[in-house]
């Protein structure tokens, strides 16, 4: 009976976001806009009006898809900020459009797809050329994606 239970992908139940006051957010920081983790690329504050608070206008780029999102909120309100984890993995192979990655601790993971666009093409080209590369993987709000690559130091 207990053989069909899989505990390998559990987490400690920690939240994928934490609250931060709007006025404390900064450009190049991260925030959740329309339910997506975004990097803040533009921010402006309007003055306190006759009725109500100063407003903060934010423009963010989704860290996974590159889409642009905008939001306006009172400066005293809290916004969610995603917990972002960044890890470097050594690329050891590519199997059926999935990256085979080796972590610092020696664990191998093969569950990440080759990213779309130029980054994916660059990873494929460098792998086929036999270069040793490190792939940077971003993890936020239970989503993961390869976002960068760099040559390994010898």
Curated annotation (Swiss-Prot):
Its main location: cytoplasm. Lys-50 undergoes hypusination, a unique post-translational modification that consists in the addition of a butylamino group from spermidine to lysine side chain, leading to the formation of the unusual amino acid hypusine. eIF-5As are the only known proteins to undergo this modification, which is essential for their function. One of its GO terms (molecular function) is translation elongation factor activity. The modification Hypusine is found at residue 50. It is found in: Cytoplasm; Nucleus; Endoplasmic reticulum membrane. GO terms for cellular component: endoplasmic reticulum membrane; nucleus. Gene3D superfamilies: 2.30.30.30, Nucleic acid-binding proteins. It is a peripheral membrane protein. Keywords: Cytoplasm, Elongation factor, Endoplasmic reticulum, Hypusine, Initiation factor, Membrane, Nucleus, Protein biosynthesis, RNA-binding. InterPro entries: IF5A-like, IF5A-like_N, NA-bd_OB-fold, Rib_uL2_dom2, Trans_elong_IF5A_hypusine_site, Transl_elong_IF5A_C, Translation_prot_SH3-like_sf. It holds the Pfam family IF5A-like_N. One of its GO terms (biological process) is translational elongation. Coiled coil: none annotated. SMART domains: eIF-5a. It comes from the Eukaryota. The keyword Methyltransferase does not apply. The keyword NADP does not apply. NCBIfam families: eIF_5A (TIGR00037). Belongs to the eIF-5A family. Binds to 80S ribosomes. Actively translating ribosomes show mutually exclusive binding of eIF5a (eif5a or eif5a2) and eef2/eEF2. Interacts with dapl1 (dapl1.L and dapl1.S); interaction takes place at the polypeptide exit tunnel of hibernating ribosomes and prevents translation. Translation factor that promotes translation elongation and termination, particularly upon ribosome stalling at specific amino acid sequence contexts. Binds between the exit (E) and peptidyl (P) site of the ribosome and promotes rescue of stalled ribosome: specifically required for efficient translation of polyproline-containing peptides as well as other motifs that stall the ribosome. Acts as a ribosome quality control (RQC) cofactor by joining the RQC complex to facilitate peptidyl transfer during CAT tailing step. This is Eukaryotic translation initiation factor 5A-1. It comes from Xenopus laevis. The gene is eif5a.L.
């Amino acid at each position: 009976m207990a053989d069909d239970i899989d505990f390998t992908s559990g987490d400690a139940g920690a939240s994928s976001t934490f609250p931060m006051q709007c006025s404390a957010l900064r450009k190049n920081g991260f925030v959740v806009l329309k339910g997506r983790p975004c990097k803040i690329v533009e921010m402006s504050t309007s003055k306190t009006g006759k009725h109500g608070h100063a407003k903060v206008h934010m423009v963010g780029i989704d860290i996974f898809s590159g889409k642009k999102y905008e939001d306006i909120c009172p400066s005293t309100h809290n916004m969610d900020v995603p917990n972002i984890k960044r890890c470097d993995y050594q690329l050891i192979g590519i199997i059926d459009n999935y990256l085979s990655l080796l972590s610092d601790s020696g664990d191998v993971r093969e569950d990440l797809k080759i990213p779309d666009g130029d980054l994916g093409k660059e990873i494929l080209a460098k792998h086929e050329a036999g270069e040793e590369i490190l792939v940077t993987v971003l993890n936020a709000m239970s989503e993961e994606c390869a976002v960068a690559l760099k040559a390994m130091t010898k």
